[in-house]
From Swiss-Prot:
One of its GO terms (biological process) is tryptophanyl-tRNA aminoacylation. Pfam families: tRNA-synt_1b. It is found in: Cytoplasm. A motif ('HIGH' region) lies at residues 74-82. It comes from Methanosarcina mazei (strain ATCC BAA-159 / DSM 3647 / Goe1 / Go1 / JCM 11833 / OCM 88) (Methanosarcina frisia). This is Tryptophan--tRNA ligase. GO terms for molecular function: ATP binding; tryptophan-tRNA ligase activity. InterPro entries: aa-tRNA-synth_Ic (IPR002305), Rossmann-like_a/b/a_fold (IPR014729), Trp-tRNA-ligase (IPR002306), Tryptophan-tRNA-ligase_arc (IPR020653). The gene is trpS. Gene3D superfamilies: HUPs, Tyrosyl-Transfer RNA Synthetase.
Length: 491
């Protein structure tokens, strides 16, 4: 299968399951039980896949720092497809994430040929106002790529770690591809890694919610994260089968390796370009090791984790641990040791002007189909509903939408409808019905022929009109609140 993903075309993916094997995306349903109060997109299998979301779920459960990052190219009307991404940004922010939103004006300039002024107008009037109206909090950062010095500087550094052959393999670039288009790709990677810069609190898990067409950006960035890091932490085995941790630092300053050795208690061996941590971890080791974390918030977080392990261990006695309990406690101690080591490694790297990026996590959501079937396209007004459409016109679009019903009323009653092929039901699934039980009831009534397309369209049209009216009122309130938000514009 050659399922080429292109961030700049209107993708039409018909079999999402094939993406699991071809691109290494994991099924989201496997991790769903680990997520506290999952979003409706998660519960309804609209989000179908992920990479490394385990670390985000753990951060939400434990209160560890994490970020959500996403971006929008200011190239047209903000519509329901963009709302899906905005909803996920806002949800993660509510769950404790520090939020970063980039307006990809460098991409719009290089790929679409838009002027900087037009990028700013579309960025504010379409995307930023709707993002705030949907609940984005002022604590988050919104920026235009062209005005964000940290992103531009990081993009330049990342550019030294990737060549034209790699970009061609990932994106299909040719000799006709402009240099600015290639630079915009490095800028996208910088967008994704920016939340882990020291000025934003340093190394932490970051999630990027995307459609599968944006996965090339994630694959590139994950590779670049490893290339940029001063050190990498590996789990290794001795000849006898025992486990130990090793910090590899090819090209790292000798002074950085020596400083790192000082901050790891117990049995440690320093080589020319790496350090082996040979100490068998236990409570005493963890209690000493955690004190080597300089950042108070992170140190306190790990102290809490160590206390939880100790509480479990004490509760398991008397008389003694079962074999399972011993394994469970050892596993927690080992995992916590690795996490503390990564924290200390990140701090030492920063002290010596290096990086310690964690490869970004990502979630993948299904595309919405067009209202008339086929692909949703910003260039075809009747295929999508813009968040700035007149509410009455939005309702009319719903009433003109393609359904999954039969040709005649009699056939519908006899054979039932096909809600999974219906763009009207899809609107309710994605956006218009919050209650899962109500949605399930609508679906079953359609399948068994007791609900007709006319009543569904009427319900969806009314809800769409109500949503657009409410959203546009909130957009006007957002316009008045813009000064309360951290927004970096192009100077």
């Amino acid at each position: 299968m050659d399922n080429k993903l292109d961030p700049w075309s209107s993708s039409n993916i018909t079999d999402y399951s094939k993406l699991f094997e071809e691109f290494g995306i994991s099924p989201f349903e496997n991790i769903l039980p680990e997520i506290p109060s999952p979003h409706k997109y998660m519960r309804r299998r609209i989000i179908f896949g992920h990479r490394d979301y385990e670390q985000i779920a753990e951060a939400m459960r434990t209160g560890a720092p994490f970020s959500v990052m996403d971006g929008f190219m200011p190239s047209g009307k903000v519509h329901l497809g963009h709302k899906m991404v905005m909803d996920q940004i806002v949800w993660h922010q509510e769950k404790g994430a520090s939020a970063f939103v980039g307006i990809a004006d460098r991409e719009a300039f290089s790929v679409r040929g838009f002027s900087w002024q037009k990028c700013r107008e579309i960025g504010v009037e379409e995307y930023i106002l709707s993002l705030i109206a949907l609940g984005f909090k002022p604590e988050g950062l919104i920026y235009f790529q062209s005005g964000c010095g940290s992103v531009k500087d990081l993009a330049f550094e990342l550019g030294a770690k990737v060549n034209f052959s790699e970009l061609s393999a990932i994106y299909g670039f040719s000799g006709e591809t402009s240099l600015s288009h290639m630079l915009s790709v490095a800028t996208q990677a910088a967008d994704i890694l920016q939340p882990q810069l020291e000025e934003f609190g340093g190394s932490k898990p970051v999630v990027v919610p995307v459609g599968p067409d944006q996965d090339p950006h994630l694959r590139l960035t994950r590779g670049l994260a490893g290339k940029m890091n001063m050190f990498r932490v590996e789990e290794r085995e001795t000849a006898e089968g025992g486990k130990y941790l090793s910090v590899r630092g090819k090209g790292a300053p000798r002074e950085a390796l020596q400083e790192l050795k000082k901050r790891i208690p117990g049995k440690v061996k320093l080589y020319e370009e790496h350090i082996d941590v040979l100490q068998t971890p236990d409570y005493a080791f963890l209690e000493r090791f955690v004190l080597q974390i300089n950042q108070p918030e992170r140190r306190n977080y790990f102290m809490t984790q160590i206390q939880e392990i100790a509480t479990f261990a004490n509760a398991a006695k008397p008389p003694e641990f079962s074999e399972y309990e011993k394994y469970f406690v050892f596993k927690r101690v080992w995992k916590t040791t690795g996490k503390i080591l990564e924290e200390v490694v990140a701090e030492v790297a920063a002290e010596f002007d290096g990086y310690a990026f964690i490869p970004p996590a990502s979630t993948y959501h299904r595309f919405m189909s067009g209202l008339q079937g086929g692909k949703m396209s910003s260039s075809i007004p009747d295929s999508h509903i813009a968040l700035t459409d007149d509410p009455k016109e939005g309702a009319k679009k719903v009433k003109r939408a393609k359904t999954g019903g039969c040709i005649t009323l009699e056939e519908q009653k006899k054979l039932g409808g096909k809600p999974d092929e219906c763009s009207v039901f899809e609107l309710m699934l994605f956006h218009l019905i919050e209650d899962d039980e109500e949605l399930l009831e609508i679906r079953e009534e359609c399948i068994y022929g007791t609900r007709m397309c006319g009543s569904c369209k009427q319900l969806a049209a009314e809800k769409m009109q109500e949503f657009l009216k409410d959203h546009q009122e909130k957009r006007e309130l957002a316009r008045e609140q813009l000064d309360e938000y951290r927004i970096i514009y192009k100077k």
